[in-house]
Amino acid sequence: MSQLQTRFFTDNKKYSVDDVPFSIPAASEVQELSNVINKLLEAKNGSRSQIEFDFLVQGQFLRTSLSNHMEAEGISTEDVVEIEYVERFTAPQPEECMMHDDWISSVEADSEWILTGSYDKTAKIWSLEGKAVMTVAGHTDVVKDVAWVKRDGLTSLLLTASLDQTILLWEWNSERNKLKARHCCRGHAGSVDTIATDPTRTKFCSGSWDKMLKIWSAVATEEEEEEEEPPSRPRKKQKTEQLGLTRTPLMTLSGHNEAVSSVLWLDSEEICSASWDHTIRLWDAETGSVKTSLTGSKVFNHISYSPLCRRLASGSTDRHVRLWDPRSKDGSLVLLSLTSHSGWVTAVKWAPSHEHQLVSGSLDNLVKLWDTRSCKAPLYDVSAHEDKVLCVDWTDSRLMLSGGADNKLYTYRYTACETDAGA
C-alpha cells in the first residue's frame, strides 16, 4: 500500500492540528511526519516553525517506516491510523562533575543538596552546582549506600550504610554547616548494602549481605539502646570509638536466601526488596511477613518503583532492565524487558514526574535513558563515565545523576517532562 489514511493528535495544545484524516505515504518515517506536522502548524498559525517531533502508533514510538511498524505490530492498514505526536525529547545535558577519592557507590539528591557515598569510607554533601559542602566521615569501611531522612528548616537528618556492618544517623545544620552523628545502628552481621527511608520519614529499612532486612526508627533521640549481638557471626572489632548512641532494630525481616541488594518502600505499609537469590519480595511492614515473591532467573542488583505507573524496574547481572507489576498474582510475569546494556545493570531509577521514563546504569560504563513506549532501544546513551557506573538518581527538579568507578559523579539536566506535559 503506497498511501495510508492517518489522523494526528497530541496532548500538547500548543502543537495541535485539525482533527481530520490525512493521506500520507506508507513509507514515511519520523522526519517526513515531522515535516508534515510543521507544515500543518505553519498553515494554521501563519508562523514558520521547525520543531522536532516523535510519533507513537498504538502507544509505541515509531522507529522505522509507518508500513514496517504496522506490519511488525500487526496493525490493520485498512482503517484510519491514529498517530500521536510529542515534541522530541532532547538529550540529557551534562552540567557538573564531582570527585571522590574512590568509587562512588551511591547517590541521593533533592531540590537543594546532593548526598553521595564512596569506597573512600566517606559520604559527601554537595550543592547542586557541584561544590563540596561537607565530608561525612565516621565509618571504618566502604560506604555502600546513603539516604536523606528529612529536612526541618535548616536541619537535615541523613543516613550512611557501610561495609563495617553499621548505619549512622547524622544531623546536619546547613546554616552553620555542622554535622553530628546521632545514632549508630547495630544489628546486621554483614555489610549493609542498601537503605531506604519510609514515606512518613520516621523509619527506615536496611538490607544486608547477611540476607536480612531490618526496620529502624529514624527519629533522633537522646536514648542509648542495649545492643544485641548477632547470634551467628561475631561483629567486627571496633577500631575507633563509636559515633552516636547505639540504636537497635525495631524488626528483622527474614526470608531471602542470599544477600539483599536493594530495598524500597512502596508505601508506608509495604517494603520491597531485591536479592542475589533471584527474587524480589514484598513485605508487610507491620507484621514482617512476605506478601508476594517475584522470581527472576538471575541476581537482582537494584530496583526502583514508580507510583505513577505502579511498576517496578529491576536491574540484573544479565544486562536486562525488566519491568514488573509488584502486586501481580503471577509472580514470574515480566511486563517488559529493556535490552541494550552489554554489562550488568547496577542501578535503575524511574523519573519522578514521568510515568514512561527511567534511567539505568551499568558496568558497561553507560547511563541509558529509556521510554517504555520505545522498548527496543533507549532514547539516549549518556557516555560521560570512563569506568563502571554504580549508581543513578533522578530528582523532582529534573536533575539526573550518576556515579561510578571513575570516582566521578555527573549531573545532567533533562527537560522532557516539560515538553511532554502539554501547554
Curated annotation (Swiss-Prot):
Its main location: nucleus. Component of the PeBoW complex, composed of bop1, pes1 and wdr12. The complex is held together by bop1, which interacts with pes1 via its N-terminal domain and with wdr12 via a high-affinity interaction between the seven-bladed beta-propeller domains of the 2 proteins. The PeBoW complex associates with the 66S pre-ribosome. Interacts (via UBL domain) with mdn1 (via VWFA/MIDAS domain). Residues 221-244 are annotated as: Disordered. This is Ribosome biogenesis protein wdr12. WD repeats lie at residues 99-136, 138-180, 187-226, 255-293, 295-334, 340-380, 384-422. Pfam families: NLE, WD40. Belongs to the WD repeat WDR12/YTM1 family. InterPro entries: G-protein_beta_WD-40_rep (IPR020472), NLE (IPR012972), WD40/YVTN_repeat-like_dom_sf (IPR015943), WD40_repeat_CS (IPR019775), WD40_repeat_dom_sf (IPR036322), WD40_rpt (IPR001680), WDR12/Ytm1 (IPR028599). The keyword Nucleus applies. Keywords: Nucleus, Repeat, Ribosome biogenesis, rRNA processing, WD repeat. Residues 4-87 are annotated as: Ubiquitin-like (UBL) domain. The keyword Transferase does not apply. It is found in: Nucleus, Nucleolus; Nucleus, Nucleoplasm. GO terms for biological process: maturation of 5.8S rRNA from tricistronic rRNA transcript (SSU-rRNA, 5.8S rRNA, LSU-rRNA); maturation of LSU-rRNA from tricistronic rRNA transcript (SSU-rRNA, 5.8S rRNA, LSU-rRNA); regulation of cell cycle. One of its GO terms (cellular component) is nucleoplasm. Component of the PeBoW complex, which is required for maturation of 28S and 5.8S ribosomal RNAs and formation of the 60S ribosome.
